[in-house]
């Protein structure tokens, strides 16, 4: 690994994912390498179908690669056992998706609390962490509102609070502003960047939004699953 990235918490080397075989083989991503340090924002840029979501699923251990390696801290994610992946998703990696993924019958606080319930944290700790998480995204006072009572930007803030309600080393966000207007999307990304810096989280965001790209420490541009020079449209 290059000397410049020895302190990276998230690394990928030669990461490849194919679907099917032979003439029917489809490239999800091909030979992608990257590294993200604590407190850094890396943007994966590309048009629809470029392979952004495939790459993020591999980085977060949601899918297994065809070839290559992913490491988060000391864990070889591609070779991890199911138990190790459960621990990874419970304690280390937080996910934020374009669709928010909130349960409509639960309040904002109850949605944020879900990962803590799954981890069997005690009630006092859950209350404290949920209150702190909602306050960190500017939603204190909205604890008892359900998703249908919140704006799109507020719902995405709840999703971010849920992803970070437990201390996380890595945050992976797939088109987090895709369903938001430009002003609200910018506010959400300002929040993500602030939390990335303040908490020392290694954050990876997939997007083609130029406002988000402008905030990045590093940009990886994908086309047909392969890394291209940034700005290369050929």
Predicted segments, located by residue:
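Short coil-to-helix segment of the ABC ATPase nucleotide-binding domain corresponding to the Q-loop/switch region
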Residues: 106-114
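Conserved ABC ATPase signature
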Residues: 146-150, 154-156
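Conserved ABC transporter NBD signature motif
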Residues: 68-76
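Helix-to-loop junction immediately C-terminal to a conserved catalytic motif
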Residues: 60
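ABC ATPase NBD coupling module
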Residues: 23-26, 77-94
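ABC ATPase C-loop
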Residues: 139, 143, 163-164
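A short, proline-enriched helix->beta-strand linker immediately N-terminal to the Walker B motif
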Residues: 165-169
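Conserved ABC ATPase "signature" region
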Residues: 75-76, 124-141
């Amino acid at each position: 690994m290059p000397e410049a990235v020895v302190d990276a918490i998230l690394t990928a080397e030669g990461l490849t994912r194919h679907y099917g075989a032979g003439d029917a083989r489809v490239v999800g991503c091909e030979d992608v390498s990257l590294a993200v340090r604590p407190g850094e924002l890396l943007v994966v840029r590309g048009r629809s179908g470029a392979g952004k979501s495939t790459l993020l699923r591999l980085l977060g251990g949601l899918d297994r690669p065809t070839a290559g390696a992913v490491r988060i801290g000391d864990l070889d994610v591609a070779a991890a056992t199911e138990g190790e992946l459960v621990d990874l998703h419970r304690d280390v990696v937080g996910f934020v998706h374009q669709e928010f993924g909130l349960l409509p019958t639960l309040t904002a606080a109850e949605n944020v609390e879900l990962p803590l319930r799954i981890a069997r944290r005690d009630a006092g700790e859950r209350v404290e962490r949920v209150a702190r998480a909602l306050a960190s995204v500017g939603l204190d006072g909205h604890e008892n509102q359900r998703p249908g009572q919140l704006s799109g930007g507020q719902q995405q803030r709840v999703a971010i609070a849920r992803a970070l309600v437990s201390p996380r080393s890595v945050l992976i966000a797939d088109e987090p502003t895709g369903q938001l207007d430009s002003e609200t999307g910018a506010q959400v990304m300002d929040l993500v960047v602030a939390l990335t810096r303040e908490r020392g989280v290694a954050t990876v965001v997939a997007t083609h939004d130029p406002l988000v790209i402008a905030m990045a420490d590093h940009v990886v541009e994908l086309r047909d699953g392969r890394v291209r020079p940034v700005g290369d449209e050929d």
